[in-house]
Amino acid sequence: MKILMRADTHVSYSVPAEGTKANFTFSQVLAALSVSLCSLVVGFVSAYTSPALVSMTDRTITSFEVTKDAGSWVGGIMPLAALAGGITGGPLIEYLGRRNTILATAVPFIVSSLLIACAVNVIMILCGRFLTGFCVGIASLSLPVYLGETLQPEVRGTLGLLPTALGNIGILVCYVAGSFMNWSILAFLGAALPVPFLILMIIIPETPRWFVNRGQEERARKALKWLRGKEADVEPELKDLMQSQAEADSQATRNTCLELFKRINLKPLSISLGLMFFQQFSGINAVIFYTVQIFKDAGSTIDSNLCTIIVGIVNFFATFMGIILIDRLGRKILLYVSDIAMILTLSILGGFFYCKAHGPDVSHLGWLPLSCFVIYILGFSLGFGPIPWLMMGEILPAKIRGPAASVVTAFNWFCTFVVTKTFQDLTVAMGPHGAFWLFGVVCIVGLFFVIIYVPETRGKSLEEIERKMMGRVPISAVVNIKPFSFNM
């Protein structure tokens, strides 16, 4: 989670791995920042229930009763609504455009938070949370698609991780504010956060790719000029966009479902689905769930609110590292580091909790789970947290990008709901040690998935990625690891 700005009209960014300097305009930074402010809102509303439920269930603060069951739905309804939003968002970004779809979530975000803040019963809170989740689902797929289609290849990774950075800032703001605000005042704060994002989104243009898709060549040229700078020669890029669109049109069918499941499109779709699966089943919910217990085992007297704030700080620091490294090392290297860190820490955490339950005595090793916790969060936030979303906007073919992103986003939120709802049952059946080890095995499978199937997209234009993904030439190569061929 970092952004580089200067007072003049351009920002210079050097990519050492390529040995060249890539210049990109301040406009691209502004575009990335504008849509990333939406991610800040997403982070805030996603974290809302964690601090809010404490005061919401306190009858001395809340004028109406919020039962334990109702409280679980206040937290659990958002992933279901986000799933619905993900399904809806695909058609919206195709028909309204990427920018307009993101912009359209601003007012509902404000309304949903006001609905919660002014609630006089649980139904109003649930309606507000459902509307919030619906907008989160739409934003989840719209942001990476917009950034993927507007940013230059040399900085697409760096600026493409900006939504994750601001999303983690939103989570941190919610945790800190929630430590001294009750649920109603916290919701009023949530209603104010979309205002800057609403204002800035009006300034930035639609993506050139969407204009080309609509046959609006002149508007695409103007959008490219805005993004690349008035003095930039955008004709080669525009020509490449139009050629790519012509190729896509020549192969397209009218049936979207049939188009999605063509052999030529299954490869990028399955890679994106796989990354989302391994993201959600990597054990992140298990580790977060046991945060307070891990701190207690380390002999800490830190209260639960401060624990969540520490999680937010570690999250932010890791994503900040990712922003610095992603366009230098590439996506796959960060995924390798992320996966290996999670495998090791989940294995050790499983062993610690097993020994705690069955012996020998490990009370003197309280520092061990705490160290594993920090390393795990760092690893997840460095790779498997943000990169699946970034790559979704990079590898999905243009002709199916809307519906495919919709499927992938809905699948992600479905996995989130399944993991959240079944995790406690899993720990009862297997014990916490069994749950940690199971997630560790999933991460091992995920590592081989990345090695074999996931392509390296660093420094490549979307058109280049698409052509190579559609062909038989694998673009998945990192250091001296040669990928297996994957022809579908």
Swiss-Prot record:
Residue ranges annotated as Extracellular topological domain: 50-72, 127-129, 182-184, 290-305, 354-372, 424-433
GO molecular function: sugar transmembrane transporter activity
Any single GO CC term annotated in Swiss-Prot or TrEMBL for this entry: plasma membrane
Keyword Transmembrane helix: yes
Coiled coil ranges: none
Membrane association type: Multi-pass membrane protein
UniProt keyword list: Cell membrane, Glycoprotein, Membrane, Transmembrane, Transmembrane helix
InterPro entries linked to this entry: MFS_dom, MFS_ERD6/Tret1-like, MFS_sugar_transport-like, MFS_trans_sf, MFS_Trehalose_Transporter, Sugar/inositol_transpt, Sugar_transporter_CS
Record Pfam families: Sugar_tr
Location(s), subcellular: Cell membrane
Function text: Fails to transport trehalose.
Glycosylation sites: 182
Name the record gives this protein: Facilitated trehalose transporter Tret1-2 homolog
Residue ranges crossing the lipid bilayer per the database entry: 29-49, 73-93, 106-126, 130-150, 161-181, 185-205, 269-289, 306-326, 333-353, 373-393, 403-423, 434-454
Family label: Belongs to the major facilitator superfamily. Sugar transporter (TC 2.A.1.1) family. Trehalose transporter subfamily.
